[in-house]
């Protein structure tokens, strides 16, 4: 994914962290669904990375058609305390040089990236309740935020709405169940827009959850991450419910087109 951060009703803040070049080695690979992969990278030099939950790193790779160097950014899905190994969650985009590059990496391969970067990160100073809304692999930076929150026993009530298409697209559900067990103030709902027979969970677009379950936003801080249509529609819907800080990360597929 190629993320672009935008904010509504908040000031754009500097991440205040230097961008470095890192060398890392692929430690493990797991296929989570038919097109989503988890990649764990162990840092070699430097051996650790300091980042804020929600930030991203960038890879460079050659364009197979023109030969020019391309840059693609991927959100860190692991928590900052796991500073020696970082996790990426990403899906395969047909014709996408970034996901193609990452999908071809094998355990033991070495690679390089730059980071951390990005203004889409968890603000810890606010006392507002937290609402996280994700579509698809937009869960990646939000996962980092949720894990960081759980580690420090954040007392703020937090809710996650995550939209996927069908049962074959489900992943990380056991982890979310465990997070809700460990954190009584955390609620997670996964909704499927095109559920198949046998699905007993929430159905419909993730916007439906916002419409039905969020009466007021006056005491909320909202984090949105996903495709451009979801970001635009969710922002408009939230605006109708009142004023609150909204932090947005709009994903693009790595062909350069909005991931709709």
Where in the sequence are the language-model features?
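Residue-level signal for short, function-critical loop segments
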Residues: 63, 92, 136, 164-166, ...
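A short, basic/flexible loop-to-alpha-helix module at the beginning of a structural domain
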Residues: 115-126
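Conserved S-adenosyl-L-methionine
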Residues: 151-157
């Amino acid at each position: 994914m190629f993320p672009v951060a935008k904010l509504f009703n908040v000031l754009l803040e500097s991440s205040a962290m230097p961008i470095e070049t890192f060398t890392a080695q692929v430690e493990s690979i797991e296929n989570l669904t038919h097109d989503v992969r988890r990649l764990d990278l162990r840092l070699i030099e430097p051996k650790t990375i300091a980042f804020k939950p929600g930030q991203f790193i960038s890879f460079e790779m050659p364009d197979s058609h023109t030969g020019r160097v391309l840059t693609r950014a991927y959100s860190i899905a692991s928590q900052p305390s796991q500073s020696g190994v970082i996790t990426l969650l990403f899906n395969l985009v047909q014709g996408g040089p970034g996901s193609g590059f990452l999908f071809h990496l094998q355990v033991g391969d070495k690679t390089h990236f730059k980071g951390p970067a990005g203004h889409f990160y968890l603000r810890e100073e606010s006392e507002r309740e937290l609402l996280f809304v994700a579509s698809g692999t937009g869960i990646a930076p939000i996962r980092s935020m949720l894990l960081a929150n759980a580690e420090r026993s954040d007392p703020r009530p937090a809710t996650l709405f995550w939209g996927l298409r069908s049962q074959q697209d489900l992943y990380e559900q056991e982890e979310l169940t465990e997070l809700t067990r460990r954190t009584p103030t955390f609620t997670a709902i996964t909704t499927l827009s095109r559920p198949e027979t046998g699905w007993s969970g929430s159905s419909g677009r993730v916007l439906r959850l916002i419409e039905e379950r969020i009466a007021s936003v006056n005491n909320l801080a909202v984090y949105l991450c996903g495709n451009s249509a979801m970001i635009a529609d969710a922002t408009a819907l939230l605006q109708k419910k009142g004023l609150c800080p909204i932090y947005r990360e709009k994903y693009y597929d790595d062909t350069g087109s909005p991931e709709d």
